[in-house]
Amino acid sequence: RQGETSRYLAARNDLYASVMIAQAILESDSGQSTLSQKPSYNFFGIKGDYNGQSVTLPTWEDDGKGNPYYIDAAFRSYGSVENSLQDYVDFLEGSYYVGVHRSNTKNYKDATAALTGVYATDTTYGDKLNSIIEQYQLTIYDTY
């Protein structure tokens, strides 16, 4: 649903739309998670608060060795889909995520590898994103 919006935002921010869409699919359970629903609209599982707004929900984490554990965490609450999408690209602007930018990668797989263990604690995060990108042929959104 958000393919063209993702293409536009990714193009303007040196990102891969395919990765952006795959992250939204994975992090929001294809838009079915409580976090991705109204009023939070957090499609990317970004923790913390947005303009002082957050919601606390249970989530699985990975200890970096493939061992999952369960915690309650505060996640950003956006109030609109547009705010969620824009905050995602703003979130990836920092030097911490320089490895996901198109100008620093050969392809989307380099970007998903750079997210693994950094954006998410899941040690198989990049593999999961790659599978989603391939399954739904999301690279069509990487052309501008």
Summary of predicted features, one role per range:
Residues R1-Y144:
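Catalytic cores of secreted/periplasmic lytic hydrolases that degrade extracellular macromolecules
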